[in-house]
Amino acid sequence: MATVIRLTRLGRKKKPFYRMVVTDSRKRRDGGWVEAIGYYNPLAETPVVKFDAERLKYWVSVGAKMSDRVATLTASK
């Protein structure tokens, strides 16, 4: 299974909220996922990014690839 770490969209119309998840690369954006490791709220006064750094490091060590957006969001932490 080729795993990737990416964002799935939650929230309602025009009010996005994203969950950072580990999933199979062949699944749809909002399809099933293996593990949720954090979230991203771009609409807060200061955008909020929270994630479990240990789990992120674990998944990258076993071969999961990060999407461009996840790599950008996690690089600042």
UniProtKB/Swiss-Prot annotation:
Pfam families reported in the protein's UniProt record = Ribosomal_S16 (PF00886)
Query: Is DNA damage tagged as a keyword?
Result: no
Entry's InterPro entries?
Ribosomal_bS16, Ribosomal_bS16_CS, Ribosomal_bS16_dom_sf
Q: Does the keyword Ribosomal protein apply?
A: yes
**According to the UniProt record, which cysteines are disulfide-bonded?**
none
Give GO terms for biological process.
translation
GO CC terms on record? cytoplasm; small ribosomal subunit
Highest rank taxon of the organism = Bacteria
Keywords assigned by UniProt? Answer: Ribonucleoprotein, Ribosomal protein
Signal peptide (residue range): none
Q: Supply the Gene3D superfamilies for this chain.
A: 3.30.1320.10
Family according to the record: Belongs to the bacterial ribosomal protein bS16 family.
Known PANTHER family for this protein?
Answer: 30S RIBOSOMAL PROTEIN S16 (PTHR12919), SMALL RIBOSOMAL SUBUNIT PROTEIN BS16M (PTHR12919:SF20)
Please give the name of this protein.
Small ribosomal subunit protein bS16
Organism encoding this protein: Wolinella succinogenes (strain ATCC 29543 / DSM 1740 / CCUG 13145 / JCM 31913 / LMG 7466 / NCTC 11488 / FDC 602W) (Vibrio succinogenes)
